Design a protein with these regions (language model features):
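Long beta-strand-rich cores associated with HINT superfamily self-processing modules
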Residues: 495-522
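Gly/Pro-rich hinge or "lid" segments in bacterial periplasmic/extracellular proteins
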Residues: 87-91, 176-228, 232-234, 240-242, ...
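N-terminal secretory signal peptides
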Residues: 1-14, 18, 25-30
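Ligand-site clamp/hinge motif
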Residues: 220-266, 386, 394
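Structural transition elements
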Residues: 38, 325-358, 374-377
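Extracytoplasmic/peripheral linker and loop segments enriched in polar/acidic and small residues
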Residues: 390, 394-405, 431-497, 522
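Surface-exposed binding/hinge segments that line
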Residues: 112, 146-188, 206-208
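N-terminal lobe/hinge region of extracytoplasmic solute-binding protein
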Residues: 52-104, 135, 197-198
Length: 522
C-alpha cells in the first residue's frame, strides 16, 4: 500500500479513496468568508502573525509526549514536522515520509524518508531520527500515543532513509496513526525539548506557557514551497472567548479559534473579519464518568444521565445551533464509518427517572465544569442540571479553575466536562478513548467485545463488513460506556480579511493547527 496506489494495495481490496480518505469530506464548508477573491492570491513572505487561542495552560510543555490541546499542537508544528500530514479533505499525505507501501495484509510497512532535510541544528534527517521519534512513545512512557502504537512489534532501519514497521496484526490505517499530533520527528537522542531542534519553518524565540509563544522564520528557504511565510509568529493564550473576539475585532490579533457561536452572526457582518465554519468535524462536547467508580458503576445511572440531558436545548442555547446532535460516542458524522443509524437519545425525563430509580443510587451526583475546558462548559453543565431536575434527579454543578484542568480534573474526578477533537479515522477515535488499554480512556470503560471488534476491523478486507464492525463498536460505546456526548460542534475560526490560509479542514480548527505554516498576508 502506498500513497501512489500499488498492486500490493489492490490486493488488500482497497481503492485509493478507501486507502487515503480517513475522514470523508462530508460537511466541509467555509461560511461567510470571501474565499473566491482570496483563492487568487499567491503565498508571499513577510509580516508578523498574531494568534489568539484557547486550548492551553501554564503547565504546557515543549515535550511532544505531553500535548493535549490546540495551543501545544499549534506551536509544535511551527518547529517540527511529522511523517504524515492530513490534508483538508482528510487524506493521509506525505510529509517527512515521501512515500510508503505495505505488503498484503498491512502488517509490514516500509516508509521512505525524504532526503536533504535538515534540523535547526544543521543535522540531516535520517532513518535513525524517525525510529527514535516513534520509540519515544513506546515502552516505558506516559505518552498518550503509546496505546495507538502498541500493535507495533519492530521498527527497523533498512537504509539511511528507509524504515520498516512490523505489527502484530495488520492495520490499513497506519499512515493515519502516524499523523497523530504527538508523533513529531526530532533528532535521534533528543532528551531536552526546551530548545526545539526541528525541521519546521520556525525557531523558538520566547517561551511563556500560559501567556505566549514567539517564533521566527528560519533563514533560507523552507523545504515546503509556499509555506512558512511569516517573519515571525506570536501565539497568545486567550482562554476567554469574549476577550479573544474583542482582540480580533480591535486588530490586536489576526486570527482566533473557537469563536463563541453566539457572536458569529454579528461577526459575519464585520467587513474586516472572515468567519470560517466547518460542519461535522468539530469538537465532541460532553461529560465523562468513571464507570469503575461509585455511583457511575451503575449502567442504569448512566442511562438516566443519557436520557436526562436535553441535547437540543443545549445546542440551541449554548452553541446557537452551530452543532449537530451527539450520540454518546465520538466518531463523527464526517467519518466514512459513522453509524448514521445510531440516533441520539431524545430527552425523556420519565425514562431517565425510571432508570435512576432502578439504579437505586443514594450518593449525591456532582459534575465538575470549567470554561477552561471549553467555552460553554459551565452553561452546558447548568442546563444539564436543569433538565435532570424534571426527572427528579439532583446534580450539583461545581465550577473549577481552567488552569490545569486537564491535569487535575479530567480523568481524576468521577464526573466532569470534556471535549474531544476529531481524529482522521474511526479506529483512532475509538482506540484512543475507549479501548481497554487506551492512554486516554477517560471513562475507564473496559469491554472485551469492543476490543476484539476494533482490532478485527483493522485487518478486515471487506469494506462492508468493516463498516458493520465499526458501526457495532459505536453502538456498544453509546449504550454501555460512561460518556454523555451531547453535541458535535462546528469548527468556528475568525480572522482578519488580510490573512490568507485559514481554510476549513477535515480534522482540527486553525487549518489543522498549521496556520503558522500554511498562512500568509495579502
Amino acid at each position: 500500500m502506498t500513497n501512489q496506489l500499488t498492486p500490493e494495495a489492490t490486493s488488500l481490496g482497497l481503492d485509493r479513496r478507501q486507502l487515503l480518505a480517513g475522514s470523508a469530506a462530508v460537511g466541509l464548508a467555509t461560511a461567510f468568508a470571501a474565499l473566491p477573491a482570496q483563492a487568487q492570491d499567491k503565498p508571499k513572505k513577510g509580516g508578523v502573525l498574531r494568534l489568539g487561542m484557547e486550548g492551553g495552560s501554564a503547565s504546557d510543555s515543549l515535550d511532544p509526549r505531553t500535548y493535549a490541546d490546540s495551543i501545544p499542537i499549534s506551536y509544535s508544528l511551527m518547529f517540527w514536522n511529522q511523517l504524515v500530514e492530513i490534508d483538508a479533505k482528510g487524506n493521509a499525505t506525505p510529509e517527512l515520509a515521501e512515500s510508503w507501501e505495505s505488503k498484503a495484509g498491512a502488517a509490514e510497512w516500509i516508509f521512505n524518508i525524504r532526503k536533504g532535510i535538515t534540523f535547526t541544528s544543521g543535522k540531516t534527517l535520517d532513518a535513525d531520527d524517525v525510529i527514535y521519534s516513534i520509540n519515544l512513545h513506546r515502552g516505558e512512557t506516559k505518552s498518550p500515543a503509546k496505546g495507538i502504537l502498541e500493535p507495533i512489534t519492530e521498527i527497523k532501519k533498512l537504509s539511511s532513509h528507509q524504515v520498516q514497521i512490523t505489527m502484530k496484526t495488520g492495520n490499513a490505517d497506519l499512515p493515519f496513526v502516524l499523523s497523530d499530533y504527538h508523533l513529531l520527528i526530532v533528532p535521534n537522542g533528543t532528551t531536552d525539548f526546551s530548545k526545539p531542534d526541528g525541521t519546521g519553518a520556525y525557531t523558538l524565540v520566547e517561551w511563556q506557557p500560559g501567556v505566549r509563544v514567539v517564533a521566527k522564520r528560519k533563514a533560507g528557504n523552507y523545504w515546503k514551497a509556499g509555506r512558512g511565510n511569516f517573519d515571525s509568529v506570536e501565539l497568545r493564550y486567550i482562554g476567554d472567548a469574549a476577550a479573544r473576539t474583542q482582540a480580533l475585532v480591535t486588530g490586536q490579533v489576526d486570527a482566533v479559534n473557537r469563536l463563541n457561536p453566539k457572536t458569529v452572526a454579528l461577526l459575519s457582518k464585520n467587513k474586516n473579519i472572515n468567519v470560517t465554519r466547518t460542519k461535522g468535524t468539530g469538537n465532541r462536547y460532553g461529560f465523562v464518568a468513571l464507570v469503575d467508580a461509585d455511583p457511575y458503576k451503575s449502567h442504569d445511572l448512566m442511562l438516566a444521565l443519557k436520557y436526562g440531558i436535553d441535547r437540543k436545548k443545549i445546542i440551541d442555547n449554548v452553541f446557537s445551533g452551530y452543532a449537530s446532535m451527539g450520540n454518546d460516542q465520538t466518531v463523527g458524522p464526517a467519518d466514512r464509518f459513522y453509524n448514521a443509524a445510531l440516533k441520539a437519545k431524545s430527552y425523556d425525563p420519565d425514562r431517565a427517572a425510571f432508570h435512576f430509580k432502578k439504579a437505586g443510587t443514594s450518593a449525591s451526583l456532582e459534575v465538575q465544569v470549567s470554561d477552561g475546558c471549553y467555552s460553554g462548559s459551565t452553561d452546558s453543565g447548568v442546563m444539564f442540571q436543569e433538565s435532570l431536575k424534571k426527572a427528579g434527579i439532583s446534580m450539583e454543578v461545581k465550577r473549577v479553575s481552567g488552569d490545569g484542568y486537564w491535569d487535575n480534573v479530567w480523568m481524576k474526578v468521577p464526573f466532569c466536562s470534556v471535549f474531544w477533537g476529531n481524529r482522521p479515522t474511526a479506529d483512532l477515535q475509538i482506540s484512543t478513548q475507549f479501548l481497554s488499554g487506551g492512554a486516554w480512556n477517560d471513562t475507564h470503560f473496559k469491554s472485551p467485545a469492543l476490543d476484539k471488534l476494533v482490532i478485527s476491523a483493522r485487518v478486515e478486507l471487506n469494506e462492508k463488513k468493516r463498516k458493520e464492525m465499526y458501526a457495532e463498536s459505536q453502538r456498544i460505546i453509546s449504550e454501555d460506556a460512561g460518556m454523555v456526548c451531547f453535541a458535535v460542534g462546528d469548527q468556528m475560526d475568525g480572522s482578519s480579511t488580510k490573512l490568507r490560509g485559514l481554510e476549513s479542514h477535515a480534522r482540527y480548527d486553525m487549518n489543522d493547527n498549521r496556520l503558522a505554516e500554511k498562512g500568509w498576508f495579502a
